[in-house]
Amino acid sequence: IYSAHTNLDIAEGGTNSTLSNLLELNNVTGLFQTGETSFLGKIGYLKQEMTLNELANFVKEKLNLNHLVISGNKSTKIKKVGLCTGKGTDADFMQIAKNNDCQCYITGGLGYHDAQYAQDIGLCVIDGTHYFTEVIIVPVLCEYIKNKIPNVECVCSKINGQTLDIL
């Protein structure tokens, strides 16, 4: 059994890298510096400009979600995004994204006051959920392990760890 959390968020090739790859972002850089060469979160450019509504549907499709929560005007044009997998709703992270000219921030665990803050600073937010912004790493890790240790069977858990549901 292999289990990792924050170290996998920060690692190059970890959850934030995987989400930026999944969303096909270009010119990707780090969001929040945590060490000399390590960052939590990513900033990057979409292949093409989209409205918030279009981007939300794109994220929903890429994360295999039936629904998601957004904050902001659905017709806002988005070209540059910041992201932080898991519960990256820290106001500092959103402010860094805004200071770097991001029009949208993608994370999980968005709450009422987080959305209020984002609106106050003029930043759209897409909540891809804590679970679904992180579970995307499982097949990536499984493939990595298979390549590094070919004689060891690597089985990805099929258990859905999402604890919230919408009726």
Predicted regions located by residue number:
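Active-site catalytic microenvironments in core metabolic enzymes, especially phosphate/sugar-handling
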Residues: 1-167
